[in-house]
Swiss-Prot record:
Catalysed transformations (reactions): (2R)-2-phosphoglycerate = phosphoenolpyruvate + H2O
CDD domains linked to this entry: enolase (cd03313)
The family this protein is said to belong to: Belongs to the enolase family.
Protein name stated in the entry: Enolase
Summary of subunit composition and partner proteins: Component of the RNA degradosome, a multiprotein complex involved in RNA processing and mRNA degradation.
Length: 436
């Protein structure tokens, strides 16, 4: 047993220039874990609370000194002397101490940073890479897979300052046989997309997640540009590369009139009409995954969408499920969607994150591990994806170090497992619900 001997919280800066919480957990023997909480832009209303100070004189009110204070005081006092490898116990102590349904006393940003730092310190104390330790916590020791990247190469919605309503247009390099090859394909398409956009006189500045953020006439235009880029890179769309979208529909859903208002296109849709709009895009392009294709509270709309599209493509719940097992359980019972997006700051601890992944898999749903639009150099989600054999990862485009850090960690893990004589499989499109 390696006891926790020191806990340190600090305010650091994320990829959007906003503060976030970093935690250090020290164990006996000199083992240290360091982790930082990410932050979202388009957030589900039922997510665990990210505690901000609200002091307009610092960081426009976005400081996290209250959350940092919770780490350095109440949380530290509660877990000092505890066994660092008792992950579930440590997480439960923090959850109970917070005492709220949504972690609003200390902030999910405080609790998560300590939770992840504890896991990293415990992994170090056991001489294990983080992905291997996560697999042990998951009850699946030695079971790994390399995730299929869903690479966000055109950004819209809340992630970009442009007129594109759909938040993410992604490529899936399904023709690859390894993770590293998938990243090469993604990079080549990304660079060719820059050329395509420039040739059309369009902006090649990037959004929060490293994808391009041009003004386009329609969402279909974004898909057409990506198709051209895939072909210019020498690949076949639908065979080597498939497509995915994150609609983030809650961001353009008008609760007053019940319409999905796509201002960039000047179009409005009822819930069912929007499902058929997406169906039309799927018929025109090889779109294999759609995330949040309805408003988070439009469960009737999601049920209809699942009936229409759920047998053909992956329907991922992000704002819909917010990595919460209570909400996911209800969704499974009602046949809503067929996949869950996993963002550990939506729920606020590693233990609860692993529970959501397990519940999804047990129900035949897929689990897509995801970054947030506000990130740091912390690459824990790469280890989470491999250690749970989740099969898919969303961590942005082929630019911005906060995104590429995760891809580079995946390269290291793939290389290490191969060198140990236990290569992790890369299953490509087979990992996507409905595509096996």
């Amino acid at each position: 047993m390696a006891k926790i001997v020191k806990v340190i919280g600090r305010e650091i800066i994320d990829s959007r220039g906003n503060p976030t919480v970093e935690a250090e957990v020290h164990l006996e023997g000199g083992f240290v874990g360091l982790a930082a909480a990410p932050s979202g832009a388009s957030t589900g209303s039922r997510e665990a609370l990210e505690l901000r100070d609200g002091d307009k004189s610092r960081f426009l009110g976005k400081g996290v000194l209250k959350a940092v204070s919770a780490v350095n005081n109440e949380i530290a006092q509660a877990i000092l002397g505890k066994d660092g490898s008792a992950q579930a116990e440590i997480d439960q102590i923090m959850i109970d101490l917070d005492g709220t349904d949504n972690k609003s006393k200390f902030g999910a940003n405080a609790i998560l940073a300590v939770s992840l730092a504890t896991a990293k310190a415990a992994a170090a104390s056991k001489g294990l890479p983080l992905y291997a330790y996560i697999a042990e916590l998951n009850g699946t020791p030695g079971v790994y897979s390399m995730p299929l990247p869903m690479m966000n190469i055109i950004n819209g919605g809340e992630h970009a300052d442009n007129n594109v309503d759909i938040q993410e247009f992604m490529i899936q390099p399904v023709g690859a046989s390894t993770l590293k090859e998938a990243l090469r394909i993604g990079a080549e398409v990304f660079h060719n997309l820059a050329k395509v956009l420039k040739s059309k006189g369009l902006n090649t500045a990037v959004g929060d997640e490293g994808g391009f953020a041009p003004n386009l006439a329609s969402n279909a235009d974004a898909l057409a540009c990506i198709k051209e880029a895939v072909e210019k890179a020498g690949y076949v769309l639908g065979k080597d590369v498939t497509l995915a979208m994150d609609c983030a529909s809650s961001e353009f859903y008008n609760k007053e009139n019940g319409l999905y208002e796509m201002k960039g296109e000047g179009k409005s849709f009822t819930s069912q009409e929007f499902t058929h709009y997406l169906e039309g895009l799927c018929n025109e392009y090889p779109i294999k995954s759609i995330e949040d294709g309805q408003d988070e509270s439009d469960w009737e709309g999601f049920a209809y969408q699942t009936k229409v599209l759920g047998g053909k493509i992956q329907l991922v719940g992000d704002d819909l499920f917010v990595t919460n097992t209570k909400i996911l359980k209800e969704g499974i019972e009602k046949g809503i969607a067929n996949s869950i997006l996993i963002k550990f700051n939506q729920i606020g601890s590693l233990t609860e994150t692993l529970a959501a992944i397990k519940m999804a898999k047990d129900a035949g749903y897929t689990a897509v591990i995801s970054h947030r639009s506000g990130e740091t150099e912390d690459a824990t989600i790469a280890d989470l994806a491999v250690g749970t054999a989740a099969g898919q990862i969303k961590t942005g485009s082929m630019s911005r170090s906060d995104r590429v850090a995760k891809y580079n960690q995946l390269i290291r893990i793939e290389e290490a497992l191969a060198a140990a004589g236990t290569p992790a499989p890369f299953n490509g499109l087979k990992e996507v619900k409905g595509q096996a």
